[in-house]
């Protein structure tokens, strides 16, 4: 899977990548692989972004930086972005991250995302999120690569509401997330935004054996 993703990026001459939250790319260690190939990849989920800056691994599937205190996060930001004044104010730190990431979304050559549900009936990719970074990763760059395990494929679009209801409640206790994205194609001729090209990488990595 890593080689497939790299070849897609290479053919598009993509050197900078923004990435939405994706546990499956953690599974295949995509960041390290692309970094060794000379491609800059930036996490855009705020928790993942903080963990990446600290050169650490996510400690939780939903809240990747839950192991870090407010002071530790403040120090990470101060060390990496001296242009901003040191602060332990959570709202100010969030604003700083937003400013940094907005510029990266605008300039990135490609965006990589995970997938929560992939609908076989329509070819639709469903992405669940609260921060809006997933939407930016999948619409702002000219190239979008979605990476997902084969267990995320569902047969019909009508299957999604029930699964979405279970997902949000079990993950964060919410009735529904702030953003629910449905992507069925790259940008069409009469559309003014969205990626010019789109690829879906399906990962097995032992899943078929577990199913058997």
Which role fits each region the language model picked out?
Residues 2-211:
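The feature marks the mature, well-folded catalytic cores of soluble enzymes
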